Amino acid sequence: MTEGRKPHINVGTIGHVDHGKTTLTAALTTVLTRRLSGANKVVKYDEIDKAPEERARGITISTAHVEYETEGRHYAHVDCPGHADYIKNMITGAAQMDVAILVVSATDGAMPQTREHILLAKQVGVKDIVTWINKCDVVEDEEMLSIVEMEVRELLSNYGYDGDGVDVVRGSAVKALEESSDGPWSEKIMELVGALEKIELPVREKDKPFLMSVEDVFSIPGRGTVVTGRIERGVIKVGDKVDIVGLRDLQSTVCTGVEMFHKALETGEAGDNAGILLRGIKKEDVERGQVLSAPGQIRSYKAFKAEVYILKKEEGGRHTPFFSNYQPQFYVRTTDVTGSIKLPSGVEMVMPGDNLSIEVALDKPVALDKGLRFAVREGGRTVGSGIITEILE
């Protein structure tokens, strides 16, 4: 990390429609700007609510991005206006979340989308959740608030979060926006920020074991075989041992060179587009769609469970439903592999616009890990998007 840059955390607001996610997002920027000017600036409700549409993996999603910072950290915060946008955002990973702020209205308590968002957060690997009970200004009865809090803690525990240990802050985003910066409701916003400050920083991609997906393979006369691609995580140095995983039997080799923009380097790291020279490997021994990895860090599998979102017709998806044993292509990292979908028991068919859990059996083994995102394609177009929730042996 460059000197002077604050550690960075990705945050997202989740919760039922109209419980106040967008108002809270506006209140966070407003209170922090009043209290700790710095790089903070007020972002109003309307600016967040009319979020621009973005395309991620062929899917259109409306997402608002705001940022704010504290003395010690920088936060990138994502808020989606519509429920469908949340589902799509979380499954495609268009905006990653290290921590989610669960917003629950004190007047309603937990609602169906509250549950759905918590489940999805767990499925897509959001490690931490902090909770904001909103609209507390309109609930006179302290006991009512305690019941809502208890209910939310129980719900979080049911979905595998630490319901007893999670920070729950009671406040009113609207009141915090209306009052002066040292008022009691603004203090509640600062209490929520304090809960975010306690979240452990995520492990940076650079500090994880090396992995790179192969995009292309070249033969350089006199030097050997070079594979190119973007380094997904970790660092590779000249002399490191690497495994070639997926599509075929595992091969082990050594990196004899790292190149970027035709310059020889000693190392390549997460985020770099690099060429890796491999010892004793012929051009025909390796192909697009395999991965290079630190020894023993990833294996290839043919089956997994996943959470998927199936595009609507208006999004360029299918016009008709599909049934169990539907066989599309799964675009995983840099390769398309045919596979068949098994629907959960009790689900007869899947309509465009649905999201659900499925099991997939691939025709060929591919390097897979939990949390990996993929596209579902048919005839060259994206018809769905998913994330692996469990690897099946």
From Swiss-Prot:
Its EC number is 3.6.5.3. Residues 79-82 are annotated as: G3. Gene3D superfamilies: P-loop containing nucleotide triphosphate hydrolases, Translation factors. It catalyses: GTP + H2O = GDP + phosphate + H(+). Signal peptide: none annotated. Belongs to the TRAFAC class translation factor GTPase superfamily. Classic translation factor GTPase family. EF-Tu/EF-1A subfamily. This is Elongation factor Tu.
